[in-house]
């Protein structure tokens, strides 16, 4: 079956500020569940100038304890892989993320885009689509998908709030 979460947001800050804030957002005291982010690969295409990065995030397992009684869910840390392509010429950064921890039981993906706004070059448009499909947990599939949908909705709101806070702290008042 699966679930999907979509969000759109305009940050009233220039693309460069938003991208720098995003790439340096974690770890932060504003989000206790993201423990570390490690860049495992980074390269720049000499022809296009596009910067490719692959990062691994280490996060706390936020699955409720009553569900962690099932051995497949009882892990202390969850690992996420993020790939990004940053094109400063076109002012677009595309990201794809997936969960590595439960890959044999579920497909969890996010696709995000940050790009300079066509309405105002001092603004940055953000779009994100996340999907979760759980197939390997038997009767728990739907329960876990419902939890995932609630968690993703809350996570998106919190992530946007963290970005807004970091942008205000680093860049001051928003641009109009």
Swiss-Prot record:
One of its GO terms (molecular function) is phosphatidic acid transfer activity. This is PRELI domain-containing protein 2. Residues 1-175 form the PRELI/MSF1 domain. The lineage of its organism: Eukaryota, Metazoa, Chordata, Craniata, Vertebrata. It holds the Pfam family PRELI. GO terms for cellular component: mitochondrial intermembrane space. GO terms for biological process: phospholipid transport. It comes from Xenopus laevis (African clawed frog). Signal peptide: none annotated.
